[in-house]
Amino acid sequence: MRYREMLASVRMLTHGGSVGLWTALIGGLLLVGCSSKPSGYRIYITNEISGDLSVIDSTSMDVVSTIPLGKRPRGIHASPDGKTIYVALSGSPPAPPGVDESTLPPPDKDADGIGVFDVAQNKMVRMLKGGSDPENFDVSLDGKTIYVSNEDASGVSFIDIAAGTITKTIKTGEEPEGVKLTPDGKLVYSTAEGDGTVSVIDAAAGTLVKTFKVGRRPRNVVFMPSAKRAYVNAENDGAVYLLDTEKNEMMQPIQLGTPGEIKPMGLALSLDSAKLYVTSGRGHKVFVIDTSTNQPAGSFEVGQRPWGLALSPDGKTLFTANGPSNDVSVVDLGTQTVTKKIKTTGGPWGVVVLK
C-alpha cells in the first residue's frame, strides 16, 4: 500500500471507528516512514568483451543490473568517497602475447578514455580523456587526480578529474599495466610488461624517481600498510616478488608454481594484511601468501582464468572475475571454497566492492 493510499485509509477508519485496524495501519505507516536503505553492499564487475558493467547485490548474490560503458572496460576503481566508479575504456583490439599486432584491426582512439559511473544514478555520466589505450589506474587520495597506464604509449598519464584533461604524461617502461599509489599518496608505482620493470613516479612533482627490474611481465603492485614493503606479480615467472620500497629494489621471489602453468594476475591483501591473495590466470586458482614469512600458504580452485579480485567489506568473502567462463566466483575465505558462481556478460575483468 502506498503512503497516500494508507493515509486515506487511516482517515476513513478513524471516522468509522475501526480502532484495531486504525492502530495496525498507523503502525504500518510509521514503518514506511522509518524505512531505510537495504543492508549489504554491491559488487561491480567490468566485462571486457561485452563492454558493460555488471552490478551484483550482496544479499541475493545475483546480477541486478547491467549497464553499457564502452569498448573494452578493464581497470576499475572507486572514488575515495564511494560515490563514483571510474573505468578504463580502450578502443585498441585485444593483442595476446605472441600475436603480430600489425595483423589486428586499427585502434579506435575515440573510444579511449576513463568512464565516470555515478553510483547513485547507476549509469555512466561522463567520459574523461585517458590517453592512448588506458588499461589500469589509481585515484589520488583527495579524489582529484587519476594516474593511468597507457599501454601502447609506454607512459603514465595524470588526469585532472574536474577538468577532464590530461595534465602530463610520464615515460615508463614498455607496455605499462599496473598502477598503484603508496598508502601516503606520494608515489606512483607502474609495472611494465614489455621490459619487466617498475617505474616510481613522484605524484606531486610529476617526475620519474627510479625504474628497476623485477621479473617477466609484471602485472600489479600492492603495498603493506607501512609502505616499506610491496608485492608485484610476474606473470611469466609464475612468481610474486617482494619489494623493498625504501631502496626501490627487489628483495626476494615467492615462487607459486611452474612458469607458464601458473600466471599470477591480480593481488589483494586481507584486511589485517596477514595474507596476500593472488589470482593465477590459466592456473584456475587463487594462491595465498603468508606476509609474515613471505611464503606460499596454500591455494584453492575458483574458476577459469581468474583475473581481478576484491574482498567483501568484512574481509570474509572473496570475489574473482573469471573471463572465459563469464562468471564471478564467490569464495568463503573461512573454508576457502566457492559457494556460488554468478553469471555476467562477456569477459569479466575487474572487480570493485562498495558498501
Question: Which functions belong to the PLM regions below?
Answer:
Residues 1-15:
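N-terminal secretory signal peptides that target proteins for export/translocation
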Residues 10-12, 19, 297, 339:
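Extended rod-forming repeat segments used as scaffolds/tethers
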